[in-house]
Amino acid sequence: GDRVFGRNYDFSATNTAIVYTDPGEGRHASYSTIDLSFLGLDADKDVETIGQKFLTLAAPYVPLDGINDAGVACGIFMSYQGEGKGTPTDTQTDRPDITSTTLLRLILDYADSVEDAVALAQQYDLHDSASSCFHYMVADSTGRSAILEWVGTDADHDADGAQRQLNVLWNDTDALSDSADWQVV
């Protein structure tokens, strides 16, 4: 194709794994990039012991980015929000709970398009992991893309991340025709 999806890691050191999953049963096959330090594995050491290898079984559930066989790509980025610029999103409604990397796995497994990814995200209360706050860039094979971010109404009401709401920034002005509050990315 003629589409490129790129990102960088700002970590000084990381122990990275590329993970391929093909779960079947209506879910997409995908490749994802994993920072094994999220599983407690030292960035400066090889994965050698049986205990370390056992931990890597959880790798499919902590992706930082990836692409599925439908052409949906997703990356997670730090968003530096709240007190100290690192208050995790911790939305509290009656929706089911999901963590940041699990949301990315859900998108890779089930989304056929950016619209599907947004619809999936809207179904959950996000609880960011790793004592950080994140937003997501999602793109698909048609060239559509969006940024999914959870933001508070203002800085004075974002002390604990509980009041944040999903805000979607689309690259397609046609999708925004009924809204006066948008920007093109």
Please annotate each region the language model reported.
Residues 128-129:
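Short, well-structured beta-strand/strand-turn elements
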